[in-house]
Amino acid sequence: MASSAVVNAEEFDSAGVKIHYEIKGAGEPVILIHGLYASAKLNWDLPGVTKELAKQYRVIALDNRGHGESGRPAADSEYGEKMAGDIIRLMDHLHLTNARVVGYSLGGMIAMKLVVQHPERVRSVVLGGMGWFRADMPGLHYWEKARDEDNMFVPAACLRAMSKLGVTAAEVKAVRVPVVMIVGDQDPLLQACVAPMHKLRPDWPEHIIKGAGHMDCVFKADFKEQLKAALEERKD
C-alpha cells in the first residue's frame, strides 16, 4: 500500500496566476477539483477523501484560481474556461500525459469543460454533486449579475464568469471518456443537473447517496466508497 504522506505542497504559475496544489500518495494520478467557495483542504482533506484515495493513487488536489491559497485575479476574463486551462497547465507542470479527474460541484463543471476541450488528457471523470451545467440554465444570468461584490471566499468575477463553463447537449453526447456521477438524494442539483445529464447519457452510471445534501455529501462514507469504486471500475 502506498504511503499517504504529503509528497509535495507547492505552487506554480498558470498563465500569470499562482495556483497552489498538494500531492499525496503514489500511483496512478488522480486530480481533485473542489467546489465553489471551498478549497482543496475544505472539499477533500477535511472529509477524508484525500487520505482515502492516497492509499492507492497519486492524489493531486489544487486550489482553483480565486480560492484558497491560489491567486485571485479581478477580471471576469480570468475565470470560466481558464479554470479548466489551469488543470491542463498543472498537468504540464507535473509532466503528466493524462490523469483521472474528480470534480465536485463547480469542480464538476470544470471537469466537464476539461473533457470536452481536452479529451486526450483525461482518462476518466467522476462528477460529484454536478451533472449537466448549461450556459442557459434558468436564473443563471440573474445569479451572475447579482454577484457584484467580492467576498472572503471568492472574487465576484469568478461568479460572473460561471456561464463560460457550460457545455452543450451535443458536446455531452460527443464525450467518449468514461464518466460516473455521484450525488446526494437531498441535493437540489440531482433534479436540476444530474437527472438531465443521465437522460442525455444513460450509459453514464449514476450513484445516489442516501441522506446526503449538496454540502455534506463528501463527508458520507458511502460517497468515498462509491468514489473509489468509480475510479476502479473505470480503469482500462
Segments from the language model and where they lie:
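Catalytic histidine-centered segment of alpha/beta-hydrolase-like enzymes
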Residues: 212-222
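Active-site loop/oxyanion-hole signature of alpha/beta-hydrolase fold enzymes
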Residues: 51, 61-100
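N-terminal cap/lid segment of alpha/beta-hydrolase-fold proteins
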Residues: 5-18
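Active-site nucleophile elbow and catalytic-triad environment of alpha/beta-hydrolase enzymes
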Residues: 155-171, 189
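Conserved loop-alpha-helix segment in the C-terminal half of the alpha/beta-hydrolase fold
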Residues: 51, 185-210
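Conserved hydrolase catalytic core segment
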Residues: 97-134
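Short beta-strand/loop motif that positions the catalytic acidic residue
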Residues: 175, 181-183
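Conserved HGGG/HGGXW glycine-rich cap/lid loop of the alpha/beta-hydrolase fold
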Residues: 17-69
